[in-house]
């Protein structure tokens, strides 16, 4: 019996063992599945990029740490690191306030005001005197100009009279020297040889 079973040709049944209609996928479900697959693939790609970027950043950070260990960092500031902050050493506002307070305490404002009032009074009095002198000069200047003009005219007249007297004396000398030569010479010698007294010298 068993041999007969083995001798029979093995045939495969073509009838489906499972109802395939119950497992058919409609078009809408197919689209949803494909969309979900694409989104999942995109998410996987984004995660891959993020992991790559994180890997790159970690690698760059490790390189920077390696360079920091090899090359010592130099301080660009002129102040050493162990020195305190300059702002704590010197406060400009406090210094200005203290200097103003000291100056106000050292100065006596009453004396300063008194000196200022005295100085202003002296300046005002001197300015009034100067104004009075200017007014007097303006009044006297025309008078002095008129006197100077009259004096120049008088000077011209006196000079003219002196020239006339000189010419007359010269004419008289010529006439006397011609008409009376002996007497003229004697008189001239007497005048030249005479000695002046003290009173005459003073005069």
Swiss-Prot record:
Biased composition (Low complexity): 49-61
Coiled coil: 126-178
Record keywords, A-Z: Coiled coil, Endosome, Transport
GO biological process: DNA catabolic process; endosome organization; regulation of protein localization
Domain of life: Eukaryota
Region (Disordered): 1-62
UniProt GO cellular component terms: BLOC-1 complex; endosome; exodeoxyribonuclease VII complex
Biased composition, class Polar residues, residue ranges: 14-25
Stored Pfam families: KxDL
Chief localisation class: other
GO molecular function: exodeoxyribonuclease VII activity
Keyword Coiled coil among record annotations: yes
Subcellular location(s) of the protein: Endosome
Family (UniProt): Belongs to the KXD1 family.
Subunit structure comment from the entry: Component of the biogenesis of lysosome-related organelles complex-1 (BLOC-1).
Its job: Component of the biogenesis of lysosome-related organelles complex-1 (BLOC-1) involved in endosomal cargo sorting.
Name under which the protein is recorded: Biogenesis of lysosome-related organelles complex 1 subunit KXD1
Organism annotation: Candida glabrata (strain ATCC 2001 / BCRC 20586 / JCM 3761 / NBRC 0622 / NRRL Y-65 / CBS 138)
Upper taxonomic lineage: Eukaryota, Fungi, Dikarya, Ascomycota, Saccharomycotina
Gene from which the chain derives: KXD1
């Amino acid at each position: 019996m068993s041999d007969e079973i083995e001798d029979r040709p093995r045939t495969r049944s073509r009838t489906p063992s499972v109802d395939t209609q119950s497992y058919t996928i409609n078009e809408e479900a197919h689209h949803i599945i494909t969309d979900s697959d694409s989104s999942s693939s995109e998410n996987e790609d984004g995660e891959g990029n993020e992991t790559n970027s994180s890997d790159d950043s970690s690698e760059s950070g490790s390189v920077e740490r390696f360079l920091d260990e090899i090359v010592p960092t130099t301080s660009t500031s002129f102040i050493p690191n162990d020195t305190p902050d300059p702002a704590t050493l010197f406060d400009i506002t406090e210094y200005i306030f203290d200097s103003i307070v000291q100056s106000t305490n050292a100065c006596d404002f009453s004396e300063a005001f008194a000196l200022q009032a005295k100085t202003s009074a002296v300046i005002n009095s001197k300015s009034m005197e100067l104004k009075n002198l200017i007014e007097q000069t303006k009044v006297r200047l025309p008078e002095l100009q008129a006197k100077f003009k009259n004096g120049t005219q008088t000077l011209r007249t006196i000079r003219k009279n002196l020239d006339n007297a000189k010419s007359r004396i010269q004419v008289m000398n010529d006439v006397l020297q011609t008409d009376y030569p002996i007497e003229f010479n004697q008189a001239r010698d007497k005048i030249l040889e005479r000695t002046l007294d003290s009173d005459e010298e003073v005069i």
